[in-house]
Amino acid sequence: MTFDDLTEGQKNAFNIVMKAIKEKKHHVTINGPAGTGKTTLTKFIIEALISTGGTGIILAAPTHAAKKILSKLSGKEASTIHSILKINPVTYEENVLFEQKEVPDLAKCRVLICDEVSMYDRKLFKILLSTIPPWCTIIGIGDNKQIRPVEPGENTAYISPFFTHKDFYQCELTEVKRSNAPIIDVATDVRNGKWNYDKVVDGHGVRGFTGDTALRDFMVNYFSIVKSLDDLFENRVMAFTNKSVDKLNSIIRKKIFETDKDFIVGEIIVMQEPLFKTYKIDGKPVSEIIFNNGQLVRIIEAEYTSTFVKARGVPGEYLIRHWDLTVETYGDDEYYREKIKIISSDEELYKFNLFLAKTAETYKNWNKGGKAPWSDFWDAKSQFSKVKALPASTFHKAQGMSVDRAFIYTPCIHYADVELAQQLLYVGVTRGRYDVFYV
């Protein structure tokens, strides 16, 4: 690709980016709807920098899934922004806070390209700006109409600071480049406030199911396409609530795997939170991420068993039934093989959460001398990991990924307010490369 192959908007953004990198006076955010060539422009910028002898180029994404997509499409290895900034979980009483425990060495970083910047919250953005060296130029790429971030402990979503901060020059792409025109046309209208509608060209596009048998027809269509484990990777069902996601996963797993078991050997599952290992170097605790939030792992061994949980100062023990899974890295990520414990039953999860709530309440009102032993709370809580089956995910978890066919379950979207519902639907429609089905 040459400069002449770019759209006028891409050319303008490219020139602004190159000028910003040269002058080092401000950063740049490239904002654009789906199909306007943000990824193409990103790759072109990277290639131009490398071809002119540029060094210190780092690619970052806010999630593991987005990192994988960015690496594949740009042709250069990307990392999660949390790993680049060395952000790890810190516990305070019963809360987990993600903080920067050590300052990373970014002295060699000249250009930091951040993808999917609509997902960056204020705290992460603040850490980013305070960490980069003064000679580093940040190039943010995203779509300000996608799902907005919410600070931990808050209920109100807000637009990412990448689109509002005074130090970021705003470039907007408007000309559609992507070839899947029906999906882009519908996505553009959804982005502007409309609801989904059908549009199919040459057998591909957006199709909905309505009427009394809509859900049944939607699932029949899904199973006409998805028939095995291999088919799950490029076909994703999306819903708003975890309850809907779990129900859809249950239906799909029962059909595909012909089992009522929660987990089976050989199945690919998705981590719903990072798995850390903590060890000491020179007497100092160091945390290492084994599996990232959103990373795929394969089940090698699966056993349903039970264990007792207890905590100092809290009367009694609680018997918790759970799965012991041995899992391994799936795909081309660094290989690990680990044992994890999963509570899959709602009844057992309720019992475990009751124990945690009782422990937290006891420790908040600790009157037995000394500090409350919060380490017991976290030792118990960290015993268990959270995972989900591969077929279905929330819209939030799907943001940043791309699949051949997207299946959108909309009934539970109506629990969201109008603005969020529009963002959810927009993210759902733009996940599919060739087809989008909705009910």
From Swiss-Prot:
Catalyzed reaction equations: Couples ATP hydrolysis with the unwinding of duplex DNA at the replication fork by translocating in the 5'-3' direction. This creates two antiparallel DNA single strands (ssDNA). The leading ssDNA polymer is the template for DNA polymerase III holoenzyme which synthesizes a continuous strand; ATP + H2O = ADP + phosphate + H(+)
Annotated GO biological process: DNA replication
Amino-acid positions noted as binding ATP in the UniProt annotation, renumbered to this chain: 32-39
MF (Gene Ontology): ATP binding; ATP hydrolysis activity; helicase activity
Pfam families: AAA_30, SH3_14
Keywords: ATP-binding, DNA replication, Helicase, Hydrolase, Isomerase, Nucleotide-binding
Quaternary structure and partners: Monomer. Interacts with UvsX and gene 32 protein.
Role, per record: DNA helicase that stimulates viral DNA replication and recombination. Plays a role in T4 DNA replication initiation by selecting and activating DNA origins. Acts by dissociating and reassociating with the DNA molecule being unwound. Unwinds DNA as a monomer in a 5'-3' direction at a rate of 250 bp/s and can efficiently displace proteins from the DNA.
PANTHER family in alphabetical order: ATP-DEPENDENT DNA HELICASE, ATP-DEPENDENT DNA HELICASE PIF1
Protein name: ATP-dependent DNA helicase dda
The organism of origin for this protein: Enterobacteria phage T4
Gene: dda
